[in-house]
Amino acid sequence: MAAPNLITPLRDICVKVVAANFEGCPTFGPLPDKYVKRIIDILPLDLPLELVGSLIADEDYWRRRSQARWKNCEVAAHGYSWKQLFFERNLMEFLEQYDPAVTDLSSLKRLLTYSRRFVQTVHIRQLPSHLDLQILFECMVNTPSSLALSYNLKEVGMDYDRSLFGMKLSDCRALAKALEHTETLTHLDLSNNSLDDDKVRMLASGLVENLSITHLNLSHNKIADRGVRALAKLLDGHSVISLLELHDNQIHTEGAESLARAFKSNQCLLSVNLRLNRMGDEGCKAVVESVRGSPTLQRLNISANAAGPGTAAAVVALLRLNNTLTELDVSCNQFGEDACGNVRRALEQNGSVRLMDVRMTGINPDDEMAIAENLRARQERVDKARVLGK
């Protein structure tokens, strides 16, 4: 029977001493990896970020630190990295709570500067300070790659004031200037920001000089025809935007026709979402006809736009002539039973579409069931081919 170890080994004492004094002496020296790991496992979780950010890459440390601060941590939304999660959420909270009357601007700039190496996505749910976003891009050189920004206000209660919500024209002007120079931002989400035509035109002045943004989300705003005309100019032959989301706005026929003219020369768009607008039959028809010969477009959504038989005829031609489109949503329109029958027959001749929504278009149950069975059989063939590696 082995004698009990009554004396703590010197190496264990050293590990504890190094961990306890890490803030004053932030180095691991030439220690073997197994001792470095033991030190990190007992490091305090309140060490300054500027200190541990560059020295500690161990994911277990950042997991413990994240879970100690927040109850719900979805690491998948942060590149499956606990370190990235911590820095992104820490920056998000600081920006959302930033008050220039209380916190010095230099503190914000310092946080942005030392966080930039570990941050890919900036997601801001409220920005009551209406901070000049040029500061963010100037400090975070070469980052972020994704910006989701919402000018809402949480927990307002009885102090509710409609003017506190949404982007101001000055916010759009500052962001437009920043967008002219950023070269790493690929995803811009400005949904639900009360953007109207004047604000979108201001943003477009910066977007026209931008060659990095590939995913643009301006949904759930108040963009009408004048604003859409400005956006259409961004979608020329030199555009790099591949995902365009304009659903739930106020786009009418004229705006739809402006987009249609731009779509004809565009060689980059992969997905366009225009649902919940007011394009009408003529506007939807123009959009569908414009993408008939597109060599790139894979997803198109024009649901809930008061489209009629004219659009249905354009959809029939699209299905017969286009072989790149894989998803099409025309639900909640007014095609009529006869037009929907033509759509069903055209789909049978099409070999590329795998998802198609024709609900609430006046289609009879037999045609709707036939379309569903057709698409289900196609998907089964695709799944089988994927399993077999074909």
Swiss-Prot record:
SUPFAM superfamilies: RNI-like (SSF52047). Disruption phenotype: Defects in DRC5 give the sup-pf4 phenotype characterized by disruption of the assembly of several other N-DRC subunits. LRR repeats lie at residues 182-205, 210-233, 238-261. It is found in: Cell projection, Cilium, Flagellum; Cytoplasm, Cytoskeleton, Flagellum axoneme. It comes from the Eukaryota. One of its GO terms (cellular component) is motile cilium. Keywords: Cell projection, Cilium, Cytoplasm, Cytoskeleton, Flagellum, Leucine-rich repeat, Repeat. Component of the nexin-dynein regulatory complex (N-DRC). Interacts with DRC1, DRC2, DRC3, DRC4, DRC7 and DRC11. Belongs to the DRC5 family. Component of the nexin-dynein regulatory complex (N-DRC) a key regulator of ciliary/flagellar motility which maintains the alignment and integrity of the distal axoneme and regulates microtubule sliding in motile axonemes. May play a role in the assembly of N-DRC. This is Dynein regulatory complex subunit 5. The lineage of its organism: Eukaryota, Viridiplantae, Chlorophyta, core chlorophytes, Chlorophyceae.
